[in-house]
């Protein structure tokens, strides 16, 4: 539920499960970002929700993180799905749908992550497996509306699909 509908509470739960606490997980996130060459990124939360001036990134750094994530088969499998179902420990079943408006509406386009806060605006990191066989990542940040985010992303990915 973290990558398909973008549930922020799932990010916190995963952080606590993996590292025992959110601060410890955020420290790991920042270490990994540095290893990936993200020079203009500092995380303060595992879910991207505004956390003051200590939480920031750039489109370039998000693209680096997306390229790394795309190499993981499980990530590729998840972000290609339009919906998912999970069963809780007490047996309740929950179905959720993607927040990626392009998934299923634009050929060879897959999601990676949607986001929105008042500070960041409407954001999306997506990708296309272009006709030339290459994979291109797009990052849109600061969209004034959700529709603007999708229009900008569509234009970027359509352009990438024309590259030779």
Where are these regions (language model features)?
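Penicillin-recognizing serine hydrolase domain
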Residues: 21-164
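Substrate-binding clefts and substrate-entry loops adjacent to catalytic sites
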Residues: 4-16, 42-44
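Signal peptide-directed extracytoplasmic domains
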Residues: 1-4, 27
């Amino acid at each position: 539920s973290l990558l398909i509908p973008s549930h922020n509470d799932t990010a916190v739960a995963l952080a606590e499960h993996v590292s025992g606490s959110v601060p410890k997980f955020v420290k790991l996130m920042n270490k990994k970002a540095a290893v990936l060459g993200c020079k203009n990124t500092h995380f303060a939360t595992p879910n991207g929700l505004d956390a003051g001036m200590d939480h920031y990134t750039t489109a370039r750094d998000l693209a680096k993180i997306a390229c790394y994530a795309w190499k993981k088969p499980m990530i590729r499998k998840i972000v290609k799905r339009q919906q998912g179902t999970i069963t809780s420990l007490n047996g309740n079943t929950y179905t959720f749908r993607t927040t990626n408006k392009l998934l299923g509406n634009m050929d060879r386009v897959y999601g990676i992550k949607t986001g929105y806060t008042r500070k960041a605006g409407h954001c999306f990191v997506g990708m296309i497996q272009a006709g030339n066989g290459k994979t291109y990542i797009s990052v849109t940040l600061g969209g004034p509306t959700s529709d603007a985010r999708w229009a900008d992303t569509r234009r970027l990915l359509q352009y990438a699909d024309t590259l030779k």
